[in-house]
């Protein structure tokens, strides 16, 4: 009896069907600089170098982590792609880069074209929100590698910034103002802890008054906010000295990454409201507050550092973008040879 690749668990026809299903989602994301379409060996992007004095390419890669476990359990796959794009483009935007193009890696044990198309639909929506082109990706069917119905995602974003406009935190000084910009919820970090705290006690369809009657699935799968266009718009109006994308490690772990040695950011907890999902995780899981801050964004998905004289203009620019933001602290002198962030209660 002859043996085929399909017999071994890899269905090439299903992969081809997936490509056909995702093309209508990817096509609207394409920018004028993109040469060719989806399905080639490599994505082609003709960078318009005339827009820059000294163009610097900026790259970022990330995944969605165990938030995917919630998507599997809820059988919802059309928003985790937004999370994937957000985790990558937010990282490159905080140095001042405009996201240009994006690629994804989708790996699963048994390929379902319909499920994969839902994932890519979300990726395309994320690219639309970020203003970047989805120019390619890889679909890997790996029999026996994942549980049935499960998959993993990785994303890759490339952007560009003019060298004189790179935001690297070197101009941050004592007395500068720290502005926190609202997150949409947990974003894509801390889900192993959130799942342990909540999903061992409650089903995903459980509704909490504290969540405005939403189900746990709704709250946990709220897509990560994409800040790329907001960052670029703010930089057009205010000389922001530093940005931090608040991901794994929370405020204490991420704010210092953009500060010069010898400085510390002191943030006052009462200056911003905390979304109910964080209080729910803390209470139901009996998670210490310090652990919450080391794990989650605690309501601030992005932090900007500006000179005191630019504080009002920064808030006005953020309001104009429809973003909630608060002055949450200031930069003080710190210990020699290190940068730190402290949240004061």
Swiss-Prot record:
Pathway: Purine metabolism; IMP biosynthesis via de novo pathway; 5-amino-1-(5-phospho-D-ribosyl)imidazole from N(2)-formyl-N(1)-(5-phospho-D-ribosyl)glycinamide: step 2/2. Keywords: ATP-binding, Cytoplasm, Ligase, Nucleotide-binding, Purine biosynthesis. GO terms for biological process: 'de novo' IMP biosynthetic process; adenine biosynthetic process. Its EC number is 6.3.3.1. It is found in: Cytoplasm. One of its GO terms (molecular function) is ATP binding. InterPro entries: PurM-like_C_dom, PurM-like_C_sf, PurM-like_N, PurM-like_N_sf, PurM_cligase. It catalyses: 2-formamido-N(1)-(5-O-phospho-beta-D-ribosyl)acetamidine + ATP = 5-amino-1-(5-phospho-beta-D-ribosyl)imidazole + ADP + phosphate + H(+). SUPFAM superfamilies: PurM C-terminal domain-like, PurM N-terminal domain-like. GO terms for cellular component: cytosol. Belongs to the AIR synthase family. This is Phosphoribosylformylglycinamidine cyclo-ligase. The lineage of its organism: Bacteria, Pseudomonadati, Myxococcota, Myxococcia, Myxococcales.
């Amino acid at each position: 009896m002859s043996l085929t690749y399909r017999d071994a668990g890899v269905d090439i026809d299903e992969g081809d069907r997936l490509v056909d299903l995702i093309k209508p989602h990817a096509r609207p994301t394409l920018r004028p600089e993109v040469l060719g379409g989806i399905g080639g060996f490599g994505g082609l992007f003709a960078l318009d170098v005339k827009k820059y004095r000294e163009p610097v390419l900026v790259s970022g890669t990330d995944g969605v982590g165990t938030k995917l476990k919630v998507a599997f359990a809820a059988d919802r796959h059309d928003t985790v792609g937004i999370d994937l794009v957000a985790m990558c483009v937010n990282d490159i935007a905080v140095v001042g880069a405009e996201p240009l193009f994006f690629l994804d890696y989708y790996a699963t044990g048994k390929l379902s074209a319909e499920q994969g198309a839902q994932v890519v639909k979300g990726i395309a929506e994320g690219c639309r929100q970020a203003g970047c082109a989805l120019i390619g990706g890889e679909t890997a069917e790996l029999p026996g590698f994942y549980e049935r119905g499960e998959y993993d995602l990785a994303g890759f974003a490339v952007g560009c910034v003019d060298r004189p406009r790179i935001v690297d935190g070197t101009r941050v000084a004592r007395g500068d103002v720290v502005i926190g910009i609202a997150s949409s919820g947990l974003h894509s970090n801390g889900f192993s802890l959130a799942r342990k705290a909540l999903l061992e006690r409650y089903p995903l369809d459980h509704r909490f008054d504290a969540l405005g009657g939403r189900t746990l699935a709704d709250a946990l799968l709220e897509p990560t906010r994409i800040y790329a266009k907001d960052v670029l718009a703010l930089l057009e109006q205010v000389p922001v000295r530093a940005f931090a994308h608040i991901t794994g490690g929370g405020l204490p772990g991420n704010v210092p990454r953009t500060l010069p040695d010898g400085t510390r950011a002191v943030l006052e907890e009462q200056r911003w409201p905390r979304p109910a999902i964080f209080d729910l995780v803390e209470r139901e899981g009996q998670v210490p507050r310090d652990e919450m801050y080391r794990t989650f964004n605690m309501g601030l998905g992005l932090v900007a550092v500006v000179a005191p004289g630019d504080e009002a203009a920064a808030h006005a620019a953020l309001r104009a973008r429809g973003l909630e933001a608060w002055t949450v602290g200031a930069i003080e002198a710190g210990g020699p040879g290190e940068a730190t962030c402290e949240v004061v209660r």
